[in-house]
Curated annotation (Swiss-Prot):
Enzyme class (EC, first level): oxidoreductase
Family under the similarity heading: Belongs to the short-chain dehydrogenases/reductases (SDR) family. 17-beta-HSD 3 subfamily.
Active site residues per record: Y207 (proton acceptor)
Species in which this protein is naturally found: Xenopus laevis
Disulfide bond annotation, renumbered to this chain: none
Protein name (database record): Very-long-chain 3-oxoacyl-CoA reductase-B
Catalysed transformations (reactions): a very-long-chain (3R)-3-hydroxyacyl-CoA + NADP(+) = a very-long-chain 3-oxoacyl-CoA + NADPH + H(+); 17beta-estradiol + NAD(+) = estrone + NADH + H(+); 17beta-estradiol + NADP(+) = estrone + NADPH + H(+)
Keyword line: Endoplasmic reticulum, Lipid biosynthesis, Lipid metabolism, Membrane, NADP, Oxidoreductase, Steroid biosynthesis, Transmembrane, Transmembrane helix
Annotated membrane topology: Multi-pass membrane protein
Pathway membership: Lipid metabolism; fatty acid biosynthesis; Steroid biosynthesis; estrogen biosynthesis
Binding residues annotated for NADP(+), in chain numbering: 54-83
Subcellular location: Endoplasmic reticulum membrane
Keyword NADP: yes
Amino acid sequence: MAPESLAEVPGCNCFWYLGVVAATWWGLRAAWCLLNGARVWVLGSGAQVGPTIGKWAVVTGATDGIGKAYAEELARRGMNIVLISRSPEKLEEAAIHIKQKFKVETKIIAADFGKPTEIYERIEAGLRDLEIGVLVNNVGISYEYPEYFLEIPDLENTLDKMININIMSVCQMTRLVLPGMLGRGKGVVLNISSASGMYPVPLLTVYSATKAFVDFFSRGLHAEYRSKGVTVQSVLPFFVATKLAKIRKPTWDKPSPETYVRSALNTVGLQTQTNGYLPHAITGWISTSLVPVSAAISMGMKMNKGLRARFLKKAKQN
C-alpha cells in the first residue's frame, strides 16, 4: 500500500531538514559575503594609511609598476617616501618626480636584493632615525616565460635570485622596520604577494611557491602583532598592466598600477588578505571557493603550456 504523504516515507523528514539547514547555511554565507564585500569595496576608505601613522613610507621595487604606484599614492597622501630599487638612475628620476609633484621629502637607497649579503646593513643605516609608518615589500621577480622546473635557464642562479628577492627581502625588510613601528604602537606592512600564491601554478612553480610564502608570512605576522598596533596585509593581485606581467594596455580586469593601488589601499584595516581590486576579488572568490584546487592546477598547466609553446616558437623564429 502506497504512503498517503511524504511524511510517511522513512527518513523523508531527515532529508527535508538537512535540505533546510543546507539552504540556510548557503544563504547566510552568501549574505555574509555580500555584506563583507559592501563593507570593503563600498565603504572602505583607506583612512588608516597616511602620515598620522608615521612620516615616512618605505617602498621596495619602487621605480616601476605597482611599487612606483604605491610610492606615488602614499606621497599624494602626504607621506615622505624612501625609494629602494636597483638602478640609481631610475631612483633619482622617480625621487625628483615625486618631490616636485607631491611636495614631499624623498630619499633613495640603491640596492640589488638578488645580492643580500651586500645590502641590508646599508639599508638599515639609510633608514635609521626615520619615523616609518608604512613598509611596502613589493620587489619581486618571475620567470621570463613559463617553464618546467629542471628546464629553467640558469636554474641554480635563478633559484638563488628568486628566493633572495621574493622571500628574503620581505623577511629582512620587515626585520629592519618592524621594531620602530612596535615602539610607537602603530604601523602598516604591505607585502605584495600574487594570486599565483593562492594555489600551485605549474610551469611557474618556484614563483608561485615564493608568493605563497609571502601570503603565509603576512597572515601569521599580522596575528602576532595586530594587538600591538601594527597591521600586516597580504596583497594578492591577479593581472595588472605592468612590465613584469607583460601587459601594456589596462582593461577593467587588468587595471593600471595606479588604479589597482588606490583600490588596494582602501582595503587596509578591513582585510588582512586582499586581492586589492573588486574584479580581482570576484575572480579570487570563484577560483578558491567554487573551483576545486585540482581543477585550478590543471587549468594553470594548460594555460602555461600554451604560453610556453608560443614563447619558444617566437624565440626560435628570431
